[in-house]
Regions:
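Generic ordered-secondary-structure signal
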Residues: 50-51, 70-72, 136, 160-161
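Mixed-charge, Lys/Arg-rich low-complexity intrinsically disordered regions
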Residues: 2-50, 58
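Intrinsically disordered, low-complexity segments enriched in small/polar residues
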Residues: 9-11, 45, 76-81, 103-105, ...
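Intrinsically disordered, low-complexity, charged/polar segments
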Residues: 88-164
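Compositionally biased, intrinsically disordered low-complexity regions
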Residues: 15, 45, 49, 80-85, ...
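Basic/aromatic-rich interaction segments and small domains that mediate binding to polyanionic partners
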Residues: 61-101
């Protein structure tokens, strides 16, 4: 499984978030399959988990955002899709939410602050996480990368807020 392989590669040493992002992208890139049915939806299929680069269109509107979302596509919405970004969920609960989303095909109740609209135009590299992978373990890899309006790192613990 991907997450276990990445943890093994990391070993006991401290690794940066960028290292984990690179390791996950490398592992997922080997598993990507072209699907001509998703050409008009930017490669997105509802109920699937995706890891991608994201550039916000109007950064002035948001106090912070995740530039490396790990999101389950819930609904198409015009020029993008609504997704549950697991990175906004406290890691203590994230794996349970990921497992619930996998088992329900994206039909689970999730924290409100984890729902975000992603524009197709803001998406960079896109990797689908296969359904037979352990979404819960992948969700716990430290790949979240929050930035503020000025492009500076935003504290992860402030982004993990169930109350919003």
């Amino acid at each position: 499984m991907i997450a276990e392989d990445i943890k093994e590669q990391a070993g006991a040493g401290r690794r940066t978030s960028a290292w984990y992002v690179n390791a996950l992208e490398t592992a997922l890139s080997n598993l990507q399959v072209e699907d001509s049915d998703t050409i008009d939806t930017g490669g997105i299929t509802l109920g699937s988990l995706f890891f991608f680069d994201y550039k916000v269109k109007h950064p002035e509107k948001y106090p912070f955002w995740d530039i490396q979302p790990l999101a389950v596509a819930l609904r198409f919405d015009g020029d993008g899709f609504l997704g549950c970004n697991l990175h906004y969920i406290n890691p203590d609960y994230r794996d349970a939410v990921a497992e619930s989303l996998l088992n329900s095909g994206g039909g689970s109740v999730v924290p409100k602050n984890s729902i975000h609209k992603y524009l197709f135009s803001g998406m960079g590299s896109l990797y689908k996480v296969p359904d037979d992978e352990d979404w819960a373990s992948i969700s716990l890899l430290p790949t979240e990368r929050f930035v503020d309006k000025r492009g500076r790192a935003y504290p992860k613990n402030r982004a993990f807020n169930w109350r919003k």
